[in-house]
């Protein structure tokens, strides 16, 4: 397995398969591997809700000030764990953008108020998993393991393989 590959001389004349290490993960904080999986969500819509409106399931987020919201095209039907709400903020360059409301079946909503419109015109996707927030981070936030996160991604997600 992946962990056995890093035992070096302890497995002399043995064969080991990489397993999850192929994707940049191993259950040992002393072993640093590069992240190989990124997840980007397309910005489907930008909305300017009225003060007092609510967002998401159970109306858990209430608009209290002038706000620019982005509706992102990924949800729990795609395998995105609902516990990503614990993360609270995504990053776009130097900007932190809060997740508002709950992850829904097909979308999540983020507060884009701090992002200049010029930058929004240049981007069409928001990173959810990348080098700054890896699957390992998401697994920790969701009290699970990276295997569960990776195997939950659904068929609706477009996969791009880079050589």
Predicted regions located by residue number:
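Active-site anion/phosphate-binding pocket segments in diverse small-molecule metabolic enzymes
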Residues: 2-163
């Amino acid at each position: 397995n992946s962990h056995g590959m890093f035992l070096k001389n302890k497995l002399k004349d043995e064969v080991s398969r990489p397993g999850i290490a192929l994707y940049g993960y191993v259950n040992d904080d002393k072993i640093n591997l590069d992240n190989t999986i990124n997840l980007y969500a397309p910005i489907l819509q930008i909305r300017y809700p009225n003060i007092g409106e609510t967002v998401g399931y159970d109306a858990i987020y209430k608009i209290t000030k002038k706000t620019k919201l982005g509706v992102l095209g990924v949800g729990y039907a795609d395998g995105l764990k609902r516990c990503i709400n614990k993360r609270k903020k995504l990053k776009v360059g130097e900007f932190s953008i809060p997740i508002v409301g709950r992850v829904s079946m097909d979308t999540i909503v983020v507060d884009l108020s701090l992002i200049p419109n010029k930058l929004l015109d240049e981007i069409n996707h928001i990173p959810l998993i990348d080098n700054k927030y890896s699957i390992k981070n998401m697994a920790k936030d969701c009290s699970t393991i990276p295997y569960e996160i990776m195997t939950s991604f659904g068929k609706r997600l477009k996969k791009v393989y880079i050589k």
